[in-house]
Design a protein with these regions (language model features):
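A conserved beta-turn-beta hairpin within the catalytic core of GNAT-like acetyltransferases
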Residues: 5-18, 28, 156-162
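C-terminal hydrophobic structural anchor segments
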Residues: 201-251
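Hydrophobic pocket-lining residues that define ligand/cofactor binding sites across diverse proteins
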Residues: 27, 44-45
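Conserved active-site alpha-helix within GNAT-family acetyltransferase domains
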Residues: 46-50, 56-74
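Conserved acetyl-CoA pyrophosphate-binding loop and the N-cap/start of the following alpha-helix
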Residues: 27-39, 170
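Hydrophobic adenine-recognition pocket in adenosine-nucleotide-binding enzymes
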Residues: 21-23
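Amide-forming acyltransferase catalytic core, primarily the GNAT-like/NAT-type
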Residues: 72-202
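C-terminal interaction segments
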Residues: 233-275
Length: 275
């Protein structure tokens, strides 16, 4: 697990990025990976951690644990040849240039994302070490004094693009292959960051076969400047919307509207959909 600072609607969380889960050949097929991941997810819930995330080498390893894709890889169709380019191989953390790079990246990634990895100096220092360890480098493109694009490359045998971020003033961000998977570990904590343009009061039922603490009903009350999320024993005769946790994750992150859900006891089902 690698810790990162993640901004969720402006609130900063220390969340764990799962780098890899692997089992030695002689220990495979004995349930070690499942028990380890189950324990991690349950512990995160007890610590009110809203979610964990990863970039999968093989999505099929993580689908049984109710991870869901929430984002695609950023792609930019842009010609940067007309901009002033600097190639950086040794950037000292906390120098002026490092601060400029961080400011540029955070400004760009926050424009269209309510949830994003917040780059602080600790993050950048670790990033520089990773790039350096594989003989990598950074490209910075400027228009006048302003950074308009950032690229990082790495690879001992074959140089590969690690990340590219381009200013929205010169290029429109497009989306490539599915990239990031998320596993919500505390529904109530995650939803507490949301706001609604109109007041809502609705019950949702989450089906979670791993994190039993959130295999439950939640009453969601929300408005422009408040959110109150409470777990309740049952819905009784009240209307509610039911999701499996993976479907809820893909839907609430705005990645996929076409997920499975059940609308129960609503006279007018459009009310549930609008909420």
């Amino acid at each position: 697990l690698n810790p990162y600072t993640v901004s969720v609607f402006g609130k900063k969380y220390g969340l764990d990025y799962i780098v890899a889960v692997a089992t030695k050949k002689e220990y495979k097929r004995q349930g070690y990976m499942r028990r380890l991941l189950d324990k991690i997810l349950i512990d995160m819930n007890s610590e009110k951690v809203p979610f964990t995330y990863l970039i999968p080498a093989n999505k099929d390893y993580y689908l049984p644990f109710d991870f869901a894709f929430v984002a695609r890889k950023n792609v930019y169709d842009v010609d940067l040849s007309s901009f002033k380019k600097s190639v950086l191989r040794c950037v000292k953390p906390e120098c002026k240039e490092a601060c400029e790079i961080l400011r540029f990246i955070n400004n760009e990634v926050s424009k269209d994302n309510d949830v994003y990895t917040y780059r602080d100096m600790h993050y950048f220092e670790r990033e520089l070490k990773e790039i350096s360890s594989e003989d990598g480098f950074i490209n910075i493109y400027r228009e006048g004094d302003d950074i308009v694009a950032y690229e990082s490359f790495w690879g001992l045998e074959k140089i590969e693009l690690k990340e590219r971020i381009v200013s929205s003033s010169i290029a429109k961000r497009e989306y490539g292959k599915e990239n990031i998977m998320v596993r919500i570990t505390d529904v109530a904590e995650f939803l507490s960051n949301f706001r609604s343009s109109k007041d809502i009061d609705i019950i949702i039922k989450i089906n979670d076969n791993i994190v039993e603490a959130q295999n439950a009903y939640f009453r969601v009350q929300m408005g422009k400047d408040f959110a109150n999320i409470v777990k309740i024993p049952d819905a009784k005769d009240s209307a509610f919307v039911e999701f499996d946790i993976a479907d809820f994750t893909a839907w609430i992150f705005g990645y996929n509207d076409d997920v499975n859900f059940n609308i129960v006891n609503f006279v007018d089902k459009s009310i549930a959909k609008d909420s």
